[in-house]
Structure formats: structure tokens, C-alpha cells
Amino acid sequence: MILPADPIFSQLLLIARNSPDEVVIDDRNLHVQAGYSHLLHDAVQLAQQLRDSLSQGPSTVGSAFIGILAPTSYESTVASLAILAVGAAGASLEELAYTLKQCSATCVLVGSQHQQTKLATQLQEQTGILKLAIPVLSPGRPPIESYTLDEDSIPSDDLPAFLFFTSGTTGAPKGVLHARRYLYAKFSVQQSELTDELCLIYDSICWSTCFISVLLHILRGERVELHELDARYDLIWDRFRDCEITKIHFSPTSWYTMMKVFQERISKLPEPSVQAYIRGAQYIRTPITLGGILPVPVKQFWLNLRGGRPIKVIYGSTEAGLLTVADPEASASEEASIGSPAPNVTVKLSDGDSGELLVKAPTLLLQYLNSPELTASCFDSEGFYKTGDLVERQGKNFIFRGRYKADFFKFWDHKIPRLHVESCLSSLPYIEEAHILPVADARCDNRVAALVRLRQDHTCVTLQSIRKDLSTMLPVYQMPTLLRILGKGDEVPRTFSEKVAMKKTVERFFPRWNNDHFMDDSIEVLGIKEILQFDTTGPLELVELW
């Protein structure tokens, strides 16, 4: 059994020789418990099927895109390793039609949940793309000693490895092509045996995050437990209570929802039961937030519940990978600190100690798929990638101020820092959930719209009362001029990475006939004449936004 002599398979074999059969992936959805020997055997079997079925040599196969039609699972991990073994690039088909339009996949690897579905049948009938089933715990597993590394087959670090898509928060998702070096850079320290770490991964996290996360955990000798919980956060809490999980990655939305489950359900249980859940939350060594900034009330809740130990903040992007890591002090800060640069990451700011964050890292994208001009435009003359994020340097750490285009908008000639206004709104004691949105108005460019959910014991909240309460925190021009209160069943539209889908949210909650007349009577509006009564011409920091 011959494998490429690259860092990925070298590391897998190193751990497998010391811990061949110990469970490294516990897939609760497929009821599969597998060790490194199972992973290698299934991946090698699938890699050989790929070569045989395509009737081409490995070098030709290696130039192809191979689709993966499977949720995050043991199967998707096997598929990923098989694709890497033949030197091809994997592409998730979670957005099937869009992905197939963007890349010419030569084959699709299909998980058991999709093999008999209408989607898989249509895929083969309408596209003619070869479809292969992903093996699970194949019989005839050989001893680990039978695997060898082919020193004459070392893939280039820059060989395409996988295709991801951006979240689509501000527009159509973009195909981001990454090289093998993206993975190589993430496990530079070799681990020779299985550790006692156990990471819980559930299906609400976006596919690209899970893809990287599962592979990296097993390459680091860390066990992975996979769940299809369908946003059943009460079940995640129950798993916390068992005091076995040591690592978990959540988006800010998930940390918020977990907080609400504790406050509304768990906290009302008998005290011994409550303490059992608290011990479980404190047992986790590395709770991580990624994909956004935690609101201060959420950050404070977890800090208190975990006895002064904060949720760890990391920052990165689909295009650039992990860029900064916050230490405990920065993670606990009420500022939107994203910490300091991760290893092997070089940064600079466009305006000295503030401005757009520009980075160099081995994890940077190869290219935007089918977009050479866009790819060229996202690098400066020195080869730094333009993240589009505005930050400010404070000592060794960076403070996140928002996305250059998505988190700042114009109100007349003024710059509205959406995240800052949202943070102030969230801090009001009667606000449970808060969103600040730009609603277009030809007379002033954009209105500042507040979309909020109230705490259960507060009902008499108006636009004027909110503006009054914000008056000590914000200048007049940053205060909301539109308000809509979310009802019990109202849910804010989100992308697959759990970020707020801004355009859809505005369309759903602020539909209108014209500038001052909205289609829903529950929207409270401050008329343009009332706005003009305020002095909006005071000393301001004016910047060119676009």
C-alpha cells in the first residue's frame, strides 16, 4: 500500500503505527467508530477506485476536481484523504448547482445518506458525471506495516487541494481554491500518538470549517466526535454535562443560542443538575469562537459560567485561513480584540496603526476560481492579501472594527460603524438580540435600522426610548431611525456559515412602498423632517468608504 510522501500521509502513518486501532473518529450519525487503520484502508481503496474508474494515471487524475456529496462525517473524511492521495482537488457539493457551474468536476464521491436520493440520481442522469460510493470500514484491512511512503511521489506544496466557497454575506459566493500548503502549515509540530483531546463537531458548522477541522484534529492525534444535531443545542449541553469534551468550535450565533438554552431551561432545573451542566462547560479546555465577534453580554456570560476562563477568540477567513489568535486576556476583553498574529503570519495595516488588515501567510488562497482579475486585485504591490477588514492596533493585539464594505455605510456624509452601533444596542438591558442594518433611502443614502428581540419582561420599548438610552453612547447621526421588534417566531436569515444575510434580512423585515411608508405597520419610522431637526454637521471623522 503506497502513499504519497507528503506531510499529511507521513503524519497519518506516524500516529497510525503507534495507535492503529484506537478510535479517532466517533461518527454518531453513521454509527461508525474508526481508527487510523480504518481511515487509511478506506481512503486507499477509494483512491484506487478513482484511478481505475477514470481510466487514467494519477498525474492526470491530479489535475481534476472531484466532488464530495456528503455531510461532515467519517465518509467525507475518507473522501478527502482519497482525493489528496491521488493529487486531485476536492469540492464540496453542499451548494450543488452553483458548485457544478463553477468547476468541472470529473467525478462525485457520494456518502450513504445521498446514494439513493433523487439528488444523486439527477446528478448522474443530467450531468453524466461519474458517481462513486464512499467505502466505510471495508473488509480485508491490512496491518499498518504494509503501508509505505513513495519518496518519488511528493506532491507540490502549491498543488490545488480543495475548493471552498465564501459565505455570501455581501454578494454571490466566490470559489476559493486552496493548495496543499494550507494544510501543511496547520500541523507543523509532529504528533506521534493519539492524545486525550476530544473535539465535538456538529453539522451546523459550515462544511469548509468542518473539512479542515476534522482533518487537522486527526493529524494532531486528537479524537473527533461527529453529531448531526440539527441545531439541538440542548443535546449539545447534555454532551457537555458528561465531562468528556475538551474542545469545541462555535460561531457567535451558536454561543449565543447555547447561552439562551442555559438561561431558559437549564437554570430552572434543580441545583444539583444545574451544577452538573456548569461543571461540563468548565471541563472544556479549549472552547473557540470563530466566524465573527462575540457580543459583550455573551462573552461575559461564558466568562462567568466558566469561572473566569474566557471563550478563545480566533480570527481568519475562507481565503486566508487562521490569521490571529487571542490569549485569555484579549479573549476576555470587552473590546472586539482578535489577538495577535498566528505563527508564520506577517501583517501590516494600511494606515500605520489602523486601517485595512493586510497579510502574508502560507495559508493564502491560490486563486478565486475563474476570476483572474479578482485574484490579482486582492493583493497589493508587495504581495500582501487585502482582507477587507478594518482593525486598530492596541499594543500587541488588534481590535476588529468591521468589514470595509459590509460593516460601514453612509448616512448623508457620515460613516456609520455598524458593529459599534450594534454593540451599544446589545448592551441595553432590555435587548436580547440586536442587529443594525442599512436600509436604502435616496434622501440620505441609508437609514440606520434597528432589528431587535426584547427580553421577556420588557414590552414597552419604542424607537424614541431606544434613541434616548443610546444618547450617552452614540452621536445623534449614528442612532437608529427605523425600528422593528422581532416576534416569537421570527428568525433572521443567515448564510450557511451562520452570518446574518444582510440583504435578505432587510428585504424580509423592512419591506416598503416608498421612503417613509413601509409595508409592515410594526416598523417604527422617524420621519425625514424629524431627522433634519438634529445637527448632523458637527465635527466628524470623514473617510472615503468606496
Swiss-Prot record:
Gene Ontology BP terms: fatty acid metabolic process
What name has this protein been given in UniProt? Acyl-CoA ligase oryP
Return one GO MF term.
Answer: ATP binding
Q: Where does ATP bind?
A: 166-174, 300-305, 403, 499
Q: Name one Pfam family in it.
A: AMP-binding
Would you say which domain of life the source belongs to?
Eukaryota
Name the enzyme group at the top EC level. ligase
Family the entry assigns: Belongs to the ATP-dependent AMP-binding enzyme family.
Q: In which pathway does it act?
A: Secondary metabolite biosynthesis
Annotated CoA binding lies at W412, D413, H414, L482, L483, R484
Q: What is the organism field in this record? A: Aspergillus oryzae (strain ATCC 42149 / RIB 40)
